[in-house]
């Protein structure tokens, strides 16, 4: 378990202060996951699509971290198992950092495909959960952002209203500087 945790920390750039607690939880889950995998026992798969869509970086980091364990035991965990393992890591990240789920406002307009691409890139930037709300650009100009919004992002050029949380004009693909700025806002 220690190697798995160390690998996850190295890949994610985040550190757990209570490795023993995380190790115990992972050990318990992975023992059951190995048994389910070896005996082809399925689990509910409704959660996997949501995890893949909402936490793509967390899921990808978990897959990379656990690859050595899969190789060591000559197993391939299902997507469902991988999703549950990712949830364990995600929950510990939230607990460790005492971070709350960040609320992001995505300003929408006339290009839903572009807006979906911006949302996907946002979700790729952080391991932590995001709640993404949507607001029309014109409505944002009149009323600003709802309370509790940590970041406003839009693919459209728009002037700031009188008061607004930090606003980033996103041009895809997001540049390295924009990615760092967004990650800093979301993970602080």
Model-derived regions: residue spans:
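A cross-family "folded-core" feature that marks the main globular domain of proteins
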Residues: 1-188
């Amino acid at each position: 378990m220690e190697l798995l945790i160390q690998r996850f920390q190295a890949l994610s750039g985040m550190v757990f202060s209570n490795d023993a607690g995380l190790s115990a939880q992972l050990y318990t889950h992975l023992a059951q996951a190995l048994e389910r995998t070896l005996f082809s026992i399925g689990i509910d798969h409704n959660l996997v699509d949501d995890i893949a869509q909402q936490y793509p970086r967390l899921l990808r980091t978990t897959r990379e971290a656990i690859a050595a364990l899969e190789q060591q035991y000559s197993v391939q965990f299902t997507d469902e198992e991988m999703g549950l393992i990712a949830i364990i890591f995600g929950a510990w990240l939230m607990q460790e950092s005492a971070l709350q789920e960040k609320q992001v406002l995505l300003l929408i307009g006339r290009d839903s495909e572009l807006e979906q691409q911006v949302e996907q890139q946002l979700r790729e930037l952080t391991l932590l959960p995001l709640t993404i709300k949507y607001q029309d650009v014109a409505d944002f100009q009149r009323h600003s952002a709802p309370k509790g919004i940590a970041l406003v992002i839009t693919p459209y050029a728009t002037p700031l209203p009188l008061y607004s949380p930090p606003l980033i004009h996103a041009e895809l693909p997001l540049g390295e500087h924009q990615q760092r700025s967004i990650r800093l806002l979301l993970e602080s």
